[in-house]
Amino acid sequence: MSNNIEKVAVLGAGTMGAQIAGHLANAGIPSCLFDISQELAEKGVGILTSLKPAPLYKPKNIELIEACNYDQHLEKIKEVDWILEAVAENLEIKHKVYTNIMDYLKDTAIVSSNTSGIPLADLTKVMSDEVKKRFLITHFFNPPRYMRLLELVKGPNTSDEIYNKMASFGENFLGKGIVHGKDTPNFVGNRIGVHGGNNAVRLAIEMGLTCEEVDKLTGTIVGRPKSGVFRTTDIVGLDVHASVSATSYNNLPDDEAR
C-alpha cells in the first residue's frame, strides 16, 4: 500500500507532541518536532529515551526526529506533507501557531490538531477557506504508541478525500482504530472520559474514599486500564484534565449532569 505522507511537522514538543513524533518514527516516518526554543525541542526528543512505557519501538528510531524551533526552522514546513499541531490547550496559542505557519504550507499539505476537545469551528477561525479544506482533528490518546484509539473529526469544509486519506493512514500505517467523531464538545472519548472521571471524584468525596481505593475500584477489576481514575488523570496531566472539563462545562449549559 502506498503512502504519500513521507514527512511530518509536529508543532509542540510536550508530552503528546514528542510521543506522536516517536510513534511516527516507529512507522518509519521522519518528522520535525517544533517548540518555541531549540532547548525545549531537543528536550522533547531526548525524553523519548527515558519515558515509561517506552515510546520508541527501537532506540535508533529517534534518529528520524529532528528538533526544530519556530525562529530558525519554519522553512522546513515547506517540506512536509502533514502538519500536526499539539501545543497547549489554549485557543489563543493555537491561533498564533497557525498564523505563523500559514505562509510555509505547501498546497497539498494536510493540517490537523491533536486538541483534546476544542471545537474545530473555533480552531479554524484564523484559516483561509483553502486551508480549511485540508484541516481536521487527529486526536491521539496518551501514550500514543500503546493507545489504539485515534479520533478523527472533520468540519463542514474538510475535503472528504483528505479525511478518508487520514483515516486510512491512521489505520494502515499507524496501527490505529479510528473513531469518527463530530464537532461536538470534547468529541467522543473525552466527552465520556471527563464525565466518568469527574463523577468518580465526586462519589469518592461523598463516600470518603482515598485515591488508591478509587483506582482499585475503577481499574482492572471492572475491565479498565490498571491506572484507574486518579492515576489516569495524573498521566494525562491535571492541566489537560481541567481544560477538557472546562470545555464540557462551558459548552454544555443544558447537560443534565451539569
Regions found by a protein language model. Name each.
Residues M1-R258:
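N-terminal glycine-rich phosphate-binding loop for ADP-containing cofactors
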